[in-house]
Curated annotation (Swiss-Prot):
Keywords: Ribonucleoprotein, Ribosomal protein, RNA-binding, rRNA-binding, tRNA-binding
Annotated Gene Ontology cellular component terms: small ribosomal subunit
GO BP field: translation
SUPFAM superfamilies in the cross-refs: Ribosomal protein S7 (SSF47973)
A Pfam family recorded for this sequence: Ribosomal_S7
Quaternary context: Part of the 30S ribosomal subunit. Contacts proteins S9 and S11.
Protein name (database record): Small ribosomal subunit protein uS7
Length: 156
């Protein structure tokens, strides 16, 4: 058995512009090779574009997009007697928002378009309107969990 103590979760500092932890998490997810200021500019430009195009508060649209993209259940592989089962599990809130942000950034990157800020803005607006690759991924995750409901008793 491990003798290590449980490590406390570090609080995520909110970003300076919107004072939001979600925006801060998105900036960190966009960042590559430690270029945080470039990642911050991309996210802030995307949110500004969202605000201009929708005529709403950009942070509200972004939070709605993340809420829409957050999965409620996911499947985890569990080995039982030589067979591997996909066991549906409920998603905790912090993991759900992390998955939603991961999918938002991934599908923004795979999108066609000129700038990353533009692609991210389009993906955020699509997710807020319950369309786009991110929402498709959430629906696929829910379908997988529904299909494997028979193995729910293997939950751990």
């Amino acid at each position: 058995m491990s003798r290590r103590k449980n490590v406390k979760k570090r609080p995520i500092p909110p970003d300076p512009v919107y004072n939001s932890c979600l925006v801060s998490m998105t900036i960190r997810r966009i960042m590559r090779s430690g270029k945080k200021s470039l990642a911050a500019n991309i996210v802030y430009d995307a949110l500004k574009t969202v605000g201009e195009r929708t005529g709403q508060e950009p942070l509200e649209v972004f939070e709605k997009a993340v809420k829409n993209a957050t999965p409620l259940v996911e499947v985890k592989a569990r080995r039982v007697g030589g067979a591997t089962y996909q066991v549906p599990m409920e998603v905790r809130s912090n993991r759900g928002s992390t998955l939603a942000l991961r999918w938002l950034v991934h599908y923004a990157r795979t999108r066609g378009g000129k700038t990353m800020a533009g692609k991210l803005a389009n993906e955020i607006m699509d997710a807020a309107n319950e369309t786009g690759g991110t929402i498709k991924k959430r629906e696929e995750t829910h379908r997988m969990a529904e299909a494997n409901k028979a193995f729910a008793h293997y939950r751990y």
